[in-house]
Amino acid sequence: MNAPLPESIRKALETVTLDDKYTLGEGRAFMSGVQALVRLPMLQRQRDAAAGLNTAGFISGYRGSPLGTYDQALWAAKKHLAANNIVFQPGVNEELGATAVWGTQQLDLYPQSKKFDGVFGIWYGKGPGVDRCSDVFKHANMAGTARHGGVIALAGGGTVSYTHLT
């Protein structure tokens, strides 16, 4: 019942840290789904760096999103995000968050002030917020993304909105 652990397992357990979910380059890292969404832009930044690109990330959305604790997890990982040139700025509402993320894709319009080769963005919100952002999404889609940019939209269903129950 309390048999000693094999040396290899004991050593592996001694090296585990709570930051592994954001810093481990290979092997197993245990994390929740929300923590995986926090790690996602860090992995994109590392992929870009391996391709010789100097990119940054920008995350915005609505704090009332059903993606519970996403904003809290982003704040908790602030030092890891900053080390990868990733900024988290929550929006006052879904539309302002989406508009801010869309703005990151206009980097190529101002080549004289470019600090980065590209900026990738993440927008998050609730289902009704997707409806509210349709104008921003339509215009952003028509404008496209920066050459070395791109955007991911994460949406969760609102618990009181029958049209968006998940």
Residue positions per predicted region:
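Anionic-ligand anchoring segments at beta-strand to alpha-helix junctions in alpha/beta enzyme folds, i.e.
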Residues: 52-96, 115
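Gly-rich Lys/Arg/Thr-decorated short loops/hinges at beta-loop-alpha junctions or inter-strand turns
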Residues: 14-25, 52-55, 76-84, 117, ...
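Glycine-rich phosphate/diphosphate-binding loops that line cofactor/substrate pockets in enzymes
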Residues: 13, 38-55, 110-116
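Active-site nucleophile and cofactor-binding loops and adjacent substrate-binding regions
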Residues: 30-31, 60-65, 86-99, 123-128, ...
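Cofactor-/ligand-binding subdomain signature composed of acidic, glycine-rich
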Residues: 2-32, 43
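Active-site-proximal alpha-helical scaffold in enzymes
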Residues: 102-110
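Conserved small/polar residues in nucleotide/adenosyl-binding loops
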Residues: 163-166
